[in-house]
Regions:
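Primarily the active-site beta-strand->alpha-helix module of PP2C/PPM metal-dependent phosphatases
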Residues: 312
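Phosphate/NTP-binding elements of NTP-utilizing enzymes
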Residues: 2-308, 320-328, 333, 345-354
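Short beta->alpha junction loops
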Residues: 332-340
Length: 354
């Protein structure tokens, strides 16, 4: 043995440092896959969809062009695919491979956070080869490195529309930030907006993951797959395609409720339901209608009708629409106004034009 030989702990630190931008490599190295007597005795590694998501993170971080741009991952899925396990492995990698990493975890309800999401994070931390590096409590995981317990930590934080300060303080410049929204469909839009506004540190690795069953057809989680899909890396995962799910139970649901029922869409297929509680026309019908091609000759006989949604309440923009037979198009969309004269002038101008 030479003087330069590393101690087992020093060798571990060096090995783990090699996975700074490789969460899949870390997961395969750090957890006791296939080891008898452990909870992972019958598993050979992360599930396929988990490995794919880890590769997305790896590719984002290993590319200097994208490394310091926020990476936002959204996954809508049915039941039993291993969302909590993925979140737990992600957090353990993030904390173990970056000094003073900051992690914030929230969920749809305080009960979900305390009894499901966070206990799973603790379980995986205790399985990891780096378990002695951190202390876990009922609401936090922090570094045992002297003087780092306040800066190098993960916290379970219940959200409230009346108390969003916890998500406004997500600054960790030149380090790493991980934000986790579990069962994201039922986290209020305001919390999303506050969290988004905080992710502005430069030269910082920022990863935001939003997972859950697609229970609602409205809200920010839904818009990750629609209005903001150019910002989020999205996937919708059918539980029947994932290793380790109870295929018989899933098939019973399909048999009982039907493949196209909202129950199966939400709990099996990872697809958002057709209609929300505030929606009159199901999304499936409008999606089909928007794909149809209508020629000018087909609607030449029909009168031109102008429709107006002034959007006096709610968060949507005001809209002026034209309809002629089965043809329709947006004429104008913009900020709402309570000045009726301004809107009347806009409408009159379009009446003159058409």
């Amino acid at each position: 043995v030479t003087d330069t030989a590393l101690s087992p702990e020093e060798q571990l630190i060096e090995d783990i440092a090699g996975f700074t931008h490789d969460p899949l490599g870390y997961a395969l190295y750090a957890f006791p896959w296939g080891e008898e007597g452990t909870e992972l005795a019958h598993a050979t590694g992360p599930r396929q969809w988990q490995a794919d998501a880890f590769r997305e993170i790896r590719d984002h971080l290993q590319n200097p062009e994208t490394r310091y741009q926020p990476l936002m991952l959204a996954r809508a899925s049915g039941h039993g695919i291993g969302k909590s396990a993925f979140i737990s492995m992600l957090i353990n990698w993030g904390m173990s491979t970056c000094d003073d990493c900051k992690v914030v975890v929230t969920a749809n309800t305080d009960n979900q956070l305390r009894t499901k999401t966070w206990p799973e994070i603790i379980k995986w931390s205790n399985l990891a080869i780096t378990k002695d590096w951190f202390t876990c409590t009922a609401t936090a995981m922090y570094s045992n490195d002297p003087g780092h317990d306040k800066r190098w930590r993960a916290d379970a934080i219940p959200w409230s529309e009346h108390n969003t300060e916890a998500f406004a303080g997500l600054h960790n410049e030149r380090k790493r930030i991980i934000v986790v929204f579990d069962e994201a469909s039922n986290i209020a839009d305001l919390v999303w907006e506050v969290a988004e506004g905080a992710l502005t540190d430069e030269d910082t690795e920022i990863i935001w993951v939003a997972f859950g069953n697609p229970t609602r057809n409205t809200g920010r989680f839904r818009e990750c797959f629609r209005k903001y899909k150019h910002r989020w890396k999205c996937a919708q995962i059918d539980s029947r395609t994932v290793e380790g799910t109870n295929k018989q139970q899933l098939q019973k649901w399909v048999d009982d409720y039907g493949e196209d029922s909202d129950f199966v869409k939400i709990r099996v297929r990872g697809i958002f339901p057709d209609a929300s509680e505030l929606q009159f026309i199901p999304t499936g019908l409008t999606d089909e209608a928007m794909k149809r091609v209508v020629t000018a000759a087909q609607v030449a006989h029909a009168p031109v009708i102008i429709g107006v949604d002034p959007a006096y309440s709610g968060v949507d923009d005001a809209v002026i629409y034209l309809r002629q037979g089965l043809h329709s198009k947006v004429l104008w969309t913009g900020n709402k106004t309570t000045d009726d004269l301004i809107m009347a002038k806009r409408i009159a101008d379009f009446e003159d034009q058409y």
